[in-house]
Amino acid sequence: IPFGVLPDKVLVNGPDYGLGLKYVLEEVGPSLRYWKLFQVKADPSKGDIILVLLPYWDRTINNILNLIKQIDWPAEIVIKFHPTVEQSKYTSQIPSKFSVTDKDLYYLFGRARMVVGQSTGTMVEAASLGIPVINIVDPEKISHNFMPEFGRELLWSSATHVKDVYRLVRQFEESIRLDPSQLVGMGEKMRNNYFCEPTEETIVRAFGLT
């Protein structure tokens, strides 16, 4: 490679993250950071919480907290802040009927009936486990949507206003009631498209350790 500027190989998390590079070898590599995603099982039909995953942008946090307070949810609201956020700044905005947790994300996925949030890759992880995801969009600000096109309107969807959230809650509750296995099946397909299990075989192959 001239000047040694380009890498010999680029590893991506999954087949659908392909960059279409012309001059550099591109391969799917093990998703080392997401190894727990392949260990946990989720069943939204048995979920007993609505998991709210907050990003680290102040305006976005305020928008989500303001919106979720206006919804009559079908399960307990459990809020997980981004680890870089000072939670005490938002205490006054969280009703006593909601709870805040610092428990392991994958433990919470195992209890989740739905996941609500914005601009965080953890929502892709949730959908990959077959958990319905509501992506909150701020109408007055550019929103970073990490969700892939796959599963839109079936496994995940975006909401801007309270009425949008209510519609999606009803839709996802019906999906959970009628055919939760379909959600799990779509989740498995998403996981296979966007993540690669870090097994000994995939690690050896990706890093040429043979």
Model-derived regions: residue spans:
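Structural motif
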Residues: 9, 49, 113-114
